[in-house]
Amino acid sequence: MEAIAKHNFARISPQKARLVADLIRGKSVDQALEILTFSNKKAAALVKKVLESAIANAEHNEGADIDDLNVAKIFVDEGPTMKRIMPRAKGRADRILKRSSHITVVVADR
């Protein structure tokens, strides 16, 4: 039994989001929620919201017991990048890349 939740186009760099995803991969959902609650990274709040959605999906759609769930898979894929311009001296300009992510969490029975 698996339940999936996704957050597409999350406004955070995939590199930064993967740091948080690596912390909870393979952990029980209780332990993962605790880790995310006390992490002071922006990505932790986004990943926590997706994890809570996956838990709710497992409970509602599959009738799973929350105590038996763990984070089977979590991965962060790169979303589209917004290109922005930052003016510089002497008529030059630099390109700013505002990256986005697709966060996917899969919870399953142990």
From Swiss-Prot:
InterPro entries: Ribosomal_uL22 (IPR001063), Ribosomal_uL22_bac/chlpt-type (IPR005727), Ribosomal_uL22_bac/org-type (IPR047867), Ribosomal_uL22_CS (IPR018260), Ribosomal_uL22_sf (IPR036394)
GO BP annotation list: translation
Pfam families, per database record: Ribosomal_L22
Family membership noted in the UniProt record: Belongs to the universal ribosomal protein uL22 family.
UniProt key word Ribonucleoprotein: yes
Native organism: Vibrio parahaemolyticus serotype O3:K6 (strain RIMD 2210633)
Organism domain of life: Bacteria
Annotated keywords: Ribonucleoprotein, Ribosomal protein, RNA-binding, rRNA-binding
Summary of subunit composition and partner proteins: Part of the 50S ribosomal subunit.
GO terms, molecular function: rRNA binding; structural constituent of ribosome
Protein function: This protein binds specifically to 23S rRNA; its binding is stimulated by other ribosomal proteins, e.g. L4, L17, and L20. It is important during the early stages of 50S assembly. It makes multiple contacts with different domains of the 23S rRNA in the assembled 50S subunit and ribosome. The globular domain of the protein is located near the polypeptide exit tunnel on the outside of the subunit, while an extended beta-hairpin is found that lines the wall of the exit tunnel in the center of the 70S ribosome.
Protein's name in the database: Large ribosomal subunit protein uL22
Record has Calcium as a keyword: no
Residues making up the signal peptide according to the UniProt record: none
Entry GO CC: cytosolic large ribosomal subunit
